[in-house]
Amino acid sequence: MTEPVYAAIEAGGTKFVCAIGTADGTLRERVRFATRDPDNTLAEARGFFEAAAQRHGTPQALGIASFGPLELDPNAPLYGRLLRTPKAGWHDADLIAPFAHLGIPVALDTDVNAAALAESTWGAGRRPDGTPLDTLVYVTVGTGIGGGVVVHGRTLRGMMHPELGHFCPRRHPDDLGFAGICPHHGDCLEGLANGPAIVARLGHELGSASPDHPIWDIEADYLGQLCALIALTLSPQRIVLGGGVMQHARLFPLIRARTQHWLGGYIARHQVETG
């Protein structure tokens, strides 16, 4: 008997990744392509799954992890659509309807919520015995800044979904002259601390910044404020930091120190690991 397969989409602002795999996470086939306009991008994804079904069998279900913001309430008129996204041309794009003809269940969540669920299932959100932690927050710091929250195996949803990148931190004293680049809030966390914001200050690519450049202290301060906010409001058992900016390992001890600073000794329990 053929092992059941599942379909998945990682819908990013610059690229789409479509895959077929099994329930244990084994990939059978994967393809990636550039994110263009909604019609052409979603048509390419649809074509991949139609062809893949001939090779691997009809998937049991499709999971879509997308950039946002998204309408995730199945009872809402705009369910499955992108809302006020900064991605040009994608406002009001329907991510579910193009795959209705596959005749399989479709699950939708944000890319960071999905990443949080993956960390909880297979990655850094597990205890030493392999069981998942009860609560986890995953933060990505890259082109954008976002956070996903898992509580007892389910991603957190409410009025919409967490948008941790859009709180407004206290400005670093050496960064008062930078206006921020968020089109909605200017100097929110994303507008101050995402990859493009760092590049805007440096005037060159992030990878060429020296390890002792003061930008890292500024970046760590803003991310430390975020971690302190998460600890005080959501009280997760673990915060996982990922994304392109976090490839700069020097940030981890700096963020840890600034998190402790902003917590002010109010929460003494902490554990920071890198890897």
Language-model region placement:
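ATP-binding/phosphotransfer module of carbohydrate and carboxylate kinases, centering on a glycine-rich
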Residues: 1-61, 70-79, 96-105, 121-133, ...
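Active-site histidine-anchored catalytic micro-motif
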Residues: 147
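Active-site glycine-centered loops adjacent to acidic/histidine catalytic or metal-binding residues
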Residues: 10, 111, 142
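A short acidic/small-residue loop/turn micro-motif
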Residues: 35-36, 162-165
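A charged helix-plus-loop insertion that forms the helical arch/lid used to bind
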Residues: 76-91
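Short, small/polar residue-rich loop motifs at catalytic or cofactor-binding pockets
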Residues: 14-15, 142-144
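General beta-strand structural signal in soluble alpha/beta enzymes
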Residues: 106-110
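A cytosolic small-molecule/anion-sensing beta-strand core signal
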Residues: 151-152
